């Protein structure tokens, strides 16, 4: 077994939305950074080019190659995005995971530079969370509050939004805070018709245009500093820990192509490999000091896994005049309206609805908030390992009665809004999808203000290992119904600002 050491100021695991931002912020602050990416590289130019192509591309399954890929990707090929970019997703045979019998979880993974944000069919919807979300626990009693507020995160949201160039409109909603927009987006005739009808009948329901941007391709900016080293095909296996100092010393990883093992050492370790992957890595990083996983004295590591409840939705014909029908897809958003000013429903939290229109067709897709539960969790399989000998994740997650009740309500409200707008409902998909299918998984290493009940402090720093940070979705306390990526990136920027300050002060 070959071993090699490398030394850096920071070692970042993962090159997706969060890992890319960590690399950018830390290198621009003067740090020498190593990014470990388990997959291959794809040029930034190609990633940007795909967004323009997607406007014209039609989803289709087509070649024998696709069929052969299904043999290696029986799970990955279940997502709508797979036909656009099959090679971006993992090989399920090489990268197995387990679930309880009759309790599936669909874990969609992209291993390449840029992570899932570089997949050609990434949704590109970027919404802020609000204090309505951050303080949900104290309002309804379902889980703790976040240890921060919108005011704490707003400057970091703004950093991300300005750099990405978020497009959208200022709507002035407390539950869906406005971003800093570089460009407004006019409503299509179909969206305006829906907005007028819904808001006239139900003033508490709002229809807004999407908030969108191109993929957050941050690594080129980090590379320009000359302080970034990017290592692809590097499968992280353990976070290295020194029991004498009580600190992480780096990351052990396997070269996916040669099978050789390496160690990368750094003053700081940042995990941004994705919710389940980062947690799996910590669980596997056991020692006499941390027999249940690194940084797990709270016992919360792996618990409170959440993914949005997801319905394939409802389809309708809009009955638009020909001059108002658009060949190009557009989409709008209906933010949460249940349990906002009152809680008269038989379920907690709420859902948002993504509205897609093209031609004379309309598609409503509700995404609901899963209430955190310690029983929904990630552990390590005792029998299954991946191709490189690393124990596979065991994912135990199921929908609750609350999820089912919320989804039933979502189907009913979507139908009534479609009908109010004069649309003809043609198809109702009311089956709740398998957990994981929303591809918005969060939780499992939550932040908090009490080290006894959380894995991380409010700056994404491990309570137990001070130079270890986890900045991806695993830090989430609750999820809200909004897409999580913008919040993940803002939290990463905030954590990096904190890291740099701690390094300068000599505390790290």
Predicted features, each with a name:
Residues 1-7:
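A short, basic/flexible loop-to-alpha-helix module at the beginning of a structural domain
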Residues 10-35:
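N-terminal Rossmann-like FAD-binding beta1-loop-alpha1 element of flavoenzymes
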Residues 12, 16-17, 189, 276, ...:
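Residue-level detector of alpha-helix initiation sites
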Residues 28, 32-58, 62, 238-245, ...:
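Glycine-rich loop(s) and the adjacent beta-strand/alpha-helix scaffold that form part
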Residues 59-91, 96-112, 116-131, 135-240, ...:
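Conserved redox-cofactor binding core of oxidoreductases
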Residues 208-215, 231-241, 363-365, 393-394, ...:
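A glycine-rich dinucleotide-binding beta-alpha-beta segment and adjacent secondary-structure elements
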Residues 478-496:
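A conserved FAD-binding loop/helix module that cradles the flavin
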């Amino acid at each position: 077994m070959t071993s090699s050491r490398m030394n850096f100021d920071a070692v970042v695991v993962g090159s997706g939305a969060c890992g890319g931002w960590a690399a950018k912020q830390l290198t621009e602050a003067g740090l020498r950074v190593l990014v470990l990416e388990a997959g291959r590289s794809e040029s930034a130019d190609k990633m940007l080019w795909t967004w323009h192509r997607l406007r014209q591309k039609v989803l289709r399954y087509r070649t024998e190659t696709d069929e052969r890929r299904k043999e290696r990707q029986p799970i990955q090929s279940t997502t709508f995005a797979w036909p656009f970019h099959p090679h971006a997703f993992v090989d399920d045979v090489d990268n197995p995971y387990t679930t309880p019998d009759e309790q599936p979880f669909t874990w969609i993974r992209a291993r390449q530079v840029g992570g899932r944000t570089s997949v050609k069919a990434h949704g590109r919807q970027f919404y802020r969370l609000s204090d309505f979300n951050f303080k949900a626990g104290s309002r309804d009693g379902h889980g703790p509050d976040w240890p921060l507020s919108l005011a704490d995160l707003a400057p970091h949201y703004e950093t991300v939004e300005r750099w990405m160039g978020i497009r959208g409109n200022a709507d002035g909603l407390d539950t869906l805070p406005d971003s800093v927009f570089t460009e407004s987006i006019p409503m299509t005739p179909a969206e305006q018709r829906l907005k007028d009808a819904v808001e006239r009948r139900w003033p508490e329901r709002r229809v807004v245009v999407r908030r969108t941007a191109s993929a957050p391709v941050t690594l080129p900016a980090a590379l320009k500093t000359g302080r970034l080293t990017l290592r692809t095909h590097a499968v992280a296996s353990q976070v290295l820990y020194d029991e004498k100092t009580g600190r992480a010393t780096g990351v052990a990883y396997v070269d996916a192509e040669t099978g050789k093992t390496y160690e990368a050492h750094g003053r700081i370790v940042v995990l941004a490999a994705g919710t389940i992957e980062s947690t799996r890595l910590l669980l596997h990083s056991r020692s006499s000091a941390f027999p249940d996983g690194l940084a797990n004295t709270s016992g919360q590591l792996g618990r409170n896994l959440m993914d949005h409840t997801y319905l394939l939705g409802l389809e309708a014909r809009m009955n638009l005049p020909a001059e108002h029908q658009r060949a190009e897809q557009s989409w709008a958003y209906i933010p949460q309206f249940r349990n906002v000013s009152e809680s008269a429903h038989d379920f907690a939290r709420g859902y948002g609805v993504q509205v897609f229109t093209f031609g004379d067709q309309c598609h409503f897709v509700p995404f609901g908030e899963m209430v955190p539960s310690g029983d929904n969790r990630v552990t390590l399989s005792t029998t299954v390992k991946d191709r490189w000998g690393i124990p596979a994740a065991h994912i135990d997650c199921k929908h609750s009665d609350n999820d089912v009740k919320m989804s039933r309500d979502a189907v009913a409200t979507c139908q009534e809004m479609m009908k109010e707008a004069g649309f003809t409902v043609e198809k109702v998909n009311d089956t709740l999808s398998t957990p994981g299918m929303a591809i918005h998984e969060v939780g499992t290493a939550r932040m908090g203000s009490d080290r006894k009940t959380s894995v991380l402090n409010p700056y994404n720093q491990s309570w137990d290992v001070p130079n270890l940070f986890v900045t991806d979705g695993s830090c989430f306390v609750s999820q809200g119904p909004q897409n999580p990526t913008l919040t993940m990136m803002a939290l990463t920027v905030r954590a990096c600002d904190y890291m740099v300050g701690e390094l300068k002060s000599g505390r790290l």
